[in-house]
Amino acid sequence: MNFDYTEEQTLLDNMVTSFVRDNYDWDTRCNIVKSEEGWKEENWKQFAELGLLGVPFDEAYGGLGGKSADLMIVMEQFGKGLVVEPYLPTVILAGGLISKLGSEEQKNSIIPEIISGKIRCCLLYTSPSPRDVLR
């Protein structure tokens, strides 16, 4: 089995590594975390411009059609930099569920908005119970 990165994966790794190196030194990260938002909108916009928000999504919705290995590359570098922008909840969790289980209407309306950086999402799970306030 060959575990070497493809040429595209090497480019992705280099791009994300450069972003983290240039934008996430320890002091900068601490200032981001201490901010009112707890993350930086400018970084989120840059993720969109770099195509990082579209890595796992199908090309039919404007994504890059990446595989799990491509997401692993992004997440590994984000982990090294302790990146705090909501990539995991938006792109992987909520976006992943919409991608796998959403209707075509949901996919066509929500996924491009995630990829463009216009919206952020989170996963909400609830189960019916007498205390369920969402019923």
What does each of the following model-derived ranges do?
Residues 32-34, 76-78, 99-103, 118, ...:
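A short linear-motif detector with a strong N-terminal bias
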Residues 117-124:
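A short, Trp-centered hydrophobic/proline-enriched beta-strand micro-motif
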Residues 125-135:
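Single conserved hydrophobic/aromatic residue that forms the stacking wall/gate
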